[in-house]
Swiss-Prot record:
Entry keyword annotation includes Metal-binding: yes
Compartments, record wording: Mitochondrion inner membrane
Record's bilayer topology term: Multi-pass membrane protein
Family: Belongs to the cytochrome b family.
Binding site for heme b b562: 83, 182
Keywords: Electron transport, Heme, Iron, Membrane, Metal-binding, Mitochondrion, Mitochondrion inner membrane, Respiratory chain, Transmembrane, Transmembrane helix, Transport, Ubiquinone
GO terms, biological process: mitochondrial electron transport, ubiquinol to cytochrome c
Any single Pfam family the record assigns to this protein: Cytochrome_B
Cellular component GO terms, alphabetical: mitochondrial inner membrane; respiratory chain complex III
Residues that bind heme b b566: 97, 196
Record's subunit section: The cytochrome bc1 complex contains 11 subunits: 3 respiratory subunits (MT-CYB, CYC1 and UQCRFS1), 2 core proteins (UQCRC1 and UQCRC2) and 6 low-molecular weight proteins (UQCRH/QCR6, UQCRB/QCR7, UQCRQ/QCR8, UQCR10/QCR9, UQCR11/QCR10 and a cleavage product of UQCRFS1). This cytochrome bc1 complex then forms a dimer.
Transmembrane segments: 33-53, 77-98, 113-133, 178-198, 226-246, 288-308, 320-340, 347-367
Protein name: Cytochrome b
Length: 379
């Protein structure tokens, strides 16, 4: 008799995705981050749901409702800090996941890669709207500054901004719609995750060698379920340590001051995971140019499959590309640091150089190096 997990219509899908899935035998811990992102999304949806039960999306009571959650709701402070730091863990896993895709050439799986970039944009939009909800100073001014960037779009910009605001400034209408969108987007993200996995399972996973492993695959369970569980354990440990011992380590003190439209904070800056893009935005003196650079800093990932003419899929045996990859990582860390600094010398200069290096590496230096390495293969 056939096992029920192989014959039942619903269990069969789960079985083919999580149990009997043929997996390369040599994938490293860097392949754990996909499942960790799934865990992060689950944590965010559950904690977010409990927060939404007590939160009120109204400019007069939003800040107080967050204080009420932290003071009066049973373990409300834990849920709030798990949600806030869970977002940081989410982005940490996301950046490593994308970095692994770049290093090991996973961008050759075009459909999976492109859905992944759409997912990255969706998660960034969700996180931005979530940051506005506590209605502190940085929430209000962050929302004002970032939404106001759309006014740089020629002809329709101003109308578009007022349409998003629901008025002539960031107000109750803005907060209400941001809450509604922040609530619905994680479920849209969940659907996109299913599509991401559907495309991935069409082709199968890549591996560190970049070699076809069809003749040598092993079942996902028990090998990789055990391996993923260890990753989940470490992620939980890190998240709980952050939420319970250092809950405000990555937050902004300004957000403990209620939003005041008449008082601008000295340094408006987003959360740490947006700082690299914010630094690129600020490094261009023109408003429209800055907005375009900001969008292109992420959108450039979509053209990477067409910019990499490499004969070997992964960087495993390409030392020049490896060196450039780590320069790119250092450059992104520099941009993250610059994004949190005030707009003055020498930070302006460093930011401009780091932004130029970022785009040069992606568009010109790395593809040229690939061509050189292709030539070296013939020597």
């Amino acid at each position: 008799m056939t096992n029920i997990r192989k014959s039942h219509p619903l269990l069969k899908i789960i079985n083919n995705s999580l149990i009997d899935l043929p997996t390369p035998p040599n994938i490293s811990s860097l392949w754990n981050f996909g499942s960790l992102l799934g865990a992060c999304l689950t944590i965010q949806i559950i904690t977010g749901l409990f927060l939404a039960m007590h939160y009120t999306a109204d400019t007069t009571t939003a800040f107080s409702s967050v204080a009420h959650i932290c003071r009066d709701v049973n373990y409300g402070w834990t849920i709030r800090y798990l949600h806030a730091n869970g977002a940081s863990m989410f982005f940490l896993c996301l950046f490593i996941h994308v970095g692994r895709g770049l290093y090991y050439g996973s961008f050759t799986l075009l459909e999976t890669w492109n859905v992944g970039i759409i997912l990255l944009f969706s998660v960034m939009a969700t996180a931005f709207m979530g940051y506005v909800l506590p209605w502190g100073q940085m929430s209000f001014w962050g929302a004002t500054v970032i939404t106001n960037l759309l006014s740089a779009i020629p002809y329709v910009g101003t109308d578009l901004v007022e349409w998003i605001w629901g008025g002539f400034s960031v107000s109750k209408a803005t907060l209400t719609r941001f809450f509604a969108l922040h609530f619905i987007l994680p479920f849209i993200i969940s659907a996109l995750v299913m599509i991401h996995l559907l495309f991935l399972h069409e082709t199968g996973s890549n591996n560190p060698l970049g070699m076809p492993s069809n003749s040598d695959k092993i079942p996902f369970h028990p090998y990789y379920t055990t391996k993923d569980f260890l990753g989940l354990l470490l992620l939980t440990l890190l998240l709980m340590t952050m939420a319970l011992f250092y809950p405000d380590l990555l937050g902004d003190p300004d957000n403990y001051t209620p939003a005041n439209p008449l008082n601008t904070p000295p340094h408006i800056k987003p959360e740490w995971y947006f700082l690299f893009a914010y630094a690129i935005l600020r490094s261009i003196p023109n408003k429209l140019g800055g907005v375009m650079a900001l969008i292109l800093s992420i959108l450039i990932l979509m053209v990477i499959p067409f910019l990499q003419p490499n004969k070997q899929q992964t960087m495993m045996f390409r030392p020049l590309s490896q060196f450039l990859f780590w320069i790119l990582v250092a450059d992104l860390l520099t941009l993250t640091w610059i994004g949190g600094q005030p707009v003055e010398e020498p930070f302006i200069n460093i930011g401009q150089m780091a932004s130029m290096l970022y785009f040069s590496l992606m568009v010109f230096i790395m593809p040229t190096t690939c061509l050189i390495e292709n030539k070296m293969l013939k020597w």
